[in-house]
């Protein structure tokens, strides 16, 4: 974009794709050039074009026919045949000849496409000039160049378009050509193809079974729920396709793969299993396998998730893709993730393990800002559950939400840290968990403080609540399952007044309503504190935010939580700070 393509790259592109078994077709010369090369003196002209540096070619294109003539006359001096051939063209025709490259020649393109009539992947390297047909053609700065009014008028006149008719669909073609083109377009396969009906929704059970265990991690709960679905069978399990960038075992996908197998076009037995070598992984590969294993390639991972998540509109068959990746390495594939969401692809992304709670593996494997990625990415709804039953509720919701016309892709941020589970009196909390948060310890009306927690530090938050509740009567503990949804709804409420609609109460406002107007909030999560600290702005409350805002390190969990101020003592200190403000 910023200049001309480096000459050395063309052969490099060939090598890369040919090594991978692709057919490479180079379209350098258009039909007019090839016909001219066949005439006396043409071989010398062809050799000159083939050896001309790209930058020189671009500059001459911008300078025009006279510059072409001067340069060619000087370089081909001593070749009467070539000079005679050049002399047959006036300046305008010479410029047209020299810029008749393969990528601008319709006949050349059609012939090349028609010749590739098999299923071998093919790379077309088509030579072009930047800004072809415009006054800025060939100039290295034309990526940011803007044509002035006079240049626009000249372009319009050269195309035979009358002033004021620039936006007419067939403008400048003439009646006969327009009639023929209209008929061609109307009869084309794209115009005649009917839009595929939306495929039926894959039924999702009313509830997912909650994995048993007094103490468990959200990552383990996720893996167990997927395993139970795989074992139970049914349409939902049959439509799930899993993938991971070489972290299948360490993200608890292994059980699902044991049940459903690896996808492979040619069947391949598990050699370790055949040799009776003990292994928890029993990975046979076959055409009906439902797991696609990738190397350490997060960009490919997100490209695959996006493609699988578009199966419904593309092929009329709905798939439910589930991809797991170490949470910090979401950042490696952000471009592919962004464009997948831009295309409204539907998938379940599981980022795990997350945060400094992955204490033993050090800062390179400990995520910090992924909650903010989840909040800021359009087309992606993010959740961070704390308990196994929340994982079950949110996974069930995700498989349903992914299929709704007004739904989106879903991101679950999970952890390998086991936490004690809580006993529920009823299921009333579930609807609020799906909306973004619920009171785990209900505050008294008019309470002056609350602890707001998200994710795996729930144990520290509960311990702090136990210690503080006598000193702070009515203290509440708010368990946020989705900073993303709370913030999104709050923002939409404020935007509504400017869009002509009446502002509607948002979930964050409703949750904080029982607290006193001057109440203080201690917010805490194993991630960027910015994911929760904004909650003070909902009702104008003071905030003492806790979280991670610098790289992690290797250590045991208590030491790391103490160092990064995520432990119970830090929450108590933050609560005390509220009343010193």
Region spans (language model):
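Thiamine diphosphate
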Residues: 1-168, 171-581, ...
């Amino acid at each position: 974009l910023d200049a001309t393509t480096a000459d050395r790259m063309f052969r490099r592109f060939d090598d890369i794709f040919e090594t991978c078994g692709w057919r490479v077709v180079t379209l350098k010369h258009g039909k007019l050039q090839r016909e001219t090369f066949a005439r006396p003196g043409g071989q010398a002209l062809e050799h000159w074009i083939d050896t001309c540096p790209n930058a020189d070619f671009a500059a001459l294109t911008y300078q025009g026919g006279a510059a072409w003539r001067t340069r060619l006359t000087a370089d081909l001096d001593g070749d009467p045949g070539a000079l005679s051939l050049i002399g047959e063209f006036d300046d305008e025709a010479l410029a047209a000849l020299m810029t008749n490259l393969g990528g601008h020649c319709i006949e050349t393109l059609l012939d090349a496409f028609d010749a590739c009539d098999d299923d071998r992947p093919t790379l077309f390297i088509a030579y072009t000039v930047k800004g072809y047909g415009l006054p800025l053609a060939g100039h290295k700065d034309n990526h940011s160049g803007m044509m002035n009014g006079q240049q626009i008028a000249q372009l319009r006149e050269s195309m035979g378009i009358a002033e004021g008719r620039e936006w007419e669909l067939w403008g400048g073609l003439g009646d006969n050509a327009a009639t023929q083109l209209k008929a061609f377009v109307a009869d084309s396969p794209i115009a005649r193809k009917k839009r595929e009906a939306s495929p039926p929704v894959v039924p999702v059970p009313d509830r997912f079974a909650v994995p048993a265990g007094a103490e468990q991690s959200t990552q383990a709960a996720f893996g167990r729920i997927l395993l139970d679905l795989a074992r139970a069978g049914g349409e939902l399990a049959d439509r799930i396709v899993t993938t991971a960038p070489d972290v299948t075992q360490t993200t608890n996908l292994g059980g699902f793969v044991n049940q459903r197998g690896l996808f492979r076009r040619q069947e391949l037995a598990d050699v370790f299993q055949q040799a009776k070598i003990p292994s928890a992984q029993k990975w046979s590969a076959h055409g009906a396998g439902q797991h696609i294993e990738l190397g350490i390639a997060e960009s490919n991972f997100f490209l695959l998730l996006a493609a699988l998540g578009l199966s419904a509109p593309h092929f009329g068959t709905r798939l439910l893709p589930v991809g797991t990746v170490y949470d910090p390495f979401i950042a490696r594939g952000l471009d592919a993730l962004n464009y997948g969401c831009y295309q409204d692809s539907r998938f379940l992304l599981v980022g795990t393990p997350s945060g400094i709670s992955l204490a033993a593996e050090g800062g390179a494997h400990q995520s910090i800002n992924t909650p903010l990625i989840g909040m800021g990415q359009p087309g992606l709804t993010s959740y961070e559950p704390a308990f196994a039953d929340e994982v079950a509720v949110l996974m069930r919701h995700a498989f349903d939400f992914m299929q709704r016309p007004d739904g989106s892709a879903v991101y679950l941020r999970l952890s390998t840290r086991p936490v004690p589970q809580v006993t529920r009196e009823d299921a009333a909390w579930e609807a609020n968990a799906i909306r973004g948060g619920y009171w785990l310890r209900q505050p008294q009306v008019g309470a002056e403080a609350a602890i707001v927690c998200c994710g795996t530090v729930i144990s520290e938050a509960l311990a702090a609540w136990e210690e503080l509740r006598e000193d702070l009567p009515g203290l509440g503990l708010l368990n946020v399952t989705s900073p993303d949804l709370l913030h999104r709804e709050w923002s939409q409420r404020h935007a509504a007044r400017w869009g002509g609609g009446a502002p509607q109460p948002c979930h964050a406002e409703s949750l904080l309503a029982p607290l006193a107007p001057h109440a203080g909030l201690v917010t805490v999560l194993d991630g960027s504190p910015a994911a929760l600290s904004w909650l003070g702005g909902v009702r104008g409350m003071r905030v003492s935010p806790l979280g991670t805002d610098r790289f992690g390190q290797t250590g045991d969990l208590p030491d790391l939580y103490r160092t990064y101020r995520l432990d119970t003592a830090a929450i108590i200190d933050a609560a005390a700070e509220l009343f010193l403000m």
